[in-house]
Amino acid sequence: QDRVEKLQDGYDWSIVRTFCLRVIRCIDNLENRIDRLNENDESVLQLEEVRDELLFALESSGVEQYRPDIGTDYRGQEKLAEAIKEKETTREPSQVGTIAKVVRPGYRYVTDEDSYKVVRTAQVKLFG
């Protein structure tokens, strides 16, 4: 019985995660279009409203967007963020291996107050 429940939970999570990733892809596409348009363009406001509605739909379902803090050590955050190969140059040795920029936000499903399941890892650029 426990095994069946675990399989069912895994299957249900797979369906939920796949759906969330499709919504997140729409949010990413809206962000890219917003970034390419002139901020004075009227369509920017409309695109931002659609993006915000999609974010609200995720958040009200327990999925939150997160961005790792700039300047924090990347070590220990590998489950929440993936580092891209390109590095940000620095002359400060203490900055090497810390997060320089969030390239793409991550999303996680909050299961209770202290735990979550990662829907999509954030992408970060490190100082190197």
Task: Please name every model-derived segment.
Residues 1-13, 18-40, 45-128:
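Extended, amphipathic alpha-helical stalk segments that mediate dimerization
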